[in-house]
Amino acid sequence: MKLTCMVIVAVLFLTAWTFVTAITSNGLENLFPNAHHEMKNPEASKLNKRCVPYEGPCNWLTQNCCDATCVVFWCL
C-alpha cells in the first residue's frame, strides 16, 4: 500500500515537472545562459580578465582595478 502511494506521488510529481518545464518556451535552455555564452566565447569570461592591484597604474576607461577605484590613472 505504501509503495503504491509512493509510486502515485512520484508519477504526479514527474507529470507536474513536465508541465512546468513545458510552459516556458525555452524549457531548460536558459538555466545557465552566461556559462553557455562564456563557453562559446572564452574572451567574455570574467575569470580571464586581469586586474591591477592597489596603488598600481590603471585604465580609467575600463576600470581594471581589483578591489579599488581608478583615480587619475592609479588604483586607490
From Swiss-Prot:
PROSITE patterns: OMEGA_CONOTOXIN. It is found in: Secreted. Pfam families: Conotoxin (PF02950). Coiled coil: none annotated. Expressed by the venom duct. It comes from the Eukaryota. Belongs to the conotoxin O1 superfamily. Omega-conotoxins act at presynaptic membranes, they bind and block voltage-gated calcium channels (Cav). Disulfide bonds join 51-66, 58-70, 65-75. The keyword Chloroplast does not apply. Keywords: Calcium channel impairing toxin, Cleavage on pair of basic residues, Disulfide bond, Ion channel impairing toxin, Knottin, Neurotoxin, Presynaptic neurotoxin, Secreted, Signal, Toxin, Voltage-gated calcium channel impairing toxin. This is Omega-conotoxin-like TxO5. It comes from Conus textile. One of its GO terms (molecular function) is ion channel inhibitor activity.
